[in-house]
Amino acid sequence: MHQIFDYENASEQNPQLYKIISEYKGKPVVGGGCKTSIHLHHEGIEELTTLLKWIGGLVPLVSHRYSNPSNDKFSHIDYLPPSDYGGGKYNFNIDAFKLVHCWGVTYDKGDGVEKHNHYPYALSFCYYVNLPEGSSPLVLDNDVIYPKEGQVIFFLSNT
């Protein structure tokens, strides 16, 4: 299962983000492409910080949807009082998620990603900055997703 959200500032931010990722890229990845450091979020890049603040603001809703099989409407109040041991109606701290790693990857035609997961982390996301025509889809547990520029896709990290 995945969750998709559209970033309303993508048309303004994405060209800058693409330039930044292109300048920081360095290490080749298995399957092709180059990626930045996994600590790109610590570089003090204003555009990235703005994007990650928006993504971080979605995490409570995303985690609620993953943890709530009955599809109850999200309300932050249902998670109060928060604690390290949970809290509220659903018995977990919705504000306990932390961004551990963040990187950018660029791919050329013919490059791709080998099947992998991000275990032992709980949530992962991909944000799409630039998708030329013919770009490969994202495949999660045999679910083929055709993202659009400016979309963030959340998924469980063990996927």
Where are these regions (language model features)?
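Non-heme Fe(II)/2-oxoglutarate
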Residues: 1-94
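Catalytic core of non-heme Fe(II) oxygenases with the double-stranded beta-helix
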Residues: 87-159
